[in-house]
Design a protein with these regions (language model features):
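Active-site/catalytic core of tyrosine-dependent DNA strand-transfer enzymes
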Residues: 53-102
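Short, cationic motifs built from Arg/Lys/His that form the positively charged side of catalytic pockets
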Residues: 1-4, 50-52, 62-66, 111
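Short, charged phosphate-coordinating catalytic segments
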Residues: 1-27, 126
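C-terminal catalytic core of tyrosine-transesterase DNA break-rejoin enzymes
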Residues: 1-5, 92-99, 109-135, 157
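Catalytic-site neighborhood detector that most strongly recognizes the C-terminal catalytic loop/helix
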Residues: 25, 132-157
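C-terminal secondary-structure termini that scaffold catalytic or DNA-interacting sites
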Residues: 27-49, 56-58, 80, 158-170
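Catalytic tyrosine of NAD(P)H-dependent dehydrogenase/reductases that use a Tyr as the general acid/base
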Residues: 107-108, 144
Length: 170
């Protein structure tokens, strides 16, 4: 999911171990040059209307997120109860990376990594498209897939191809 979809999640969007994406946040500049963040009651594209499933290993975080703020309309709010914007997510992630002493990652890099993990594990294309909110798997393959294999893993893959296995080579 995108950070704009995350910023627009409401408690009613949760289902058992999944959540429905039905809206997104948009950002634009006002006449005085300040950014305005608004939730639109529709996603960026038709493919954005979807249900995203949560892997079993992450069920624990679902309950933690849901119970952390049960009385507000939006799931992710700041200390004052105000809905967190996409910029809040980006800044928080940056602070966490700094605290951990790791290279800064953007929410979009995390999304790209998730898409790559799904593709690398040969997940069904329809499921990938649903999780990512894409109408065409080529979008995920072209813009989100990064080769995460080590050189040794690449050597093993290429060496396993019968035509390249070296049978008969000197």
């Amino acid at each position: 999911m995108t950070k704009a979809e995350l910023a627009a999640l409401k408690h009613g969007d949760w289902e058992e171990h999944s959540f429905r994406i039905r809206r997104t946040e948009t950002r634009y500049r006002s006449e005085d040059g300040t950014y305005i963040y608004e939730v639109k009651e529709f996603p960026k594209t038709a493919a954005g209307v979807r249900t995203v499933v949560i892997p079993k290993a992450w069920f624990w975080i679902e309950e933690k997120i849901r119970s952390s703020n049960p009385n507000e309309e939006y799931i992710f709010v700041d200390a004052k109860g105000k809905r967190m914007t996409t910029n809040c997510f980006r800044r928080r992630l940056e602070r966490v990376c700094n605290r951990l002493g790791i290279v800064k990652k953007s929410p979009h890099k995390i999304r790209k990594t998730y898409g790559s993990i799904l593709l690398d594990n040969h997940v069904d294309n329809r499921l990938i498209m649903g999780q990512m909110g894409h109408t065409d798997i080529r979008c995920t393959e072209t813009h989100y897939h990064r080769n995460r294999r080590s050189v040794q893993q690449k050597i093993q893959i290429v060496s396993a191809i019968p035509e390249l296995s070296g049978v008969g080579a000197k």
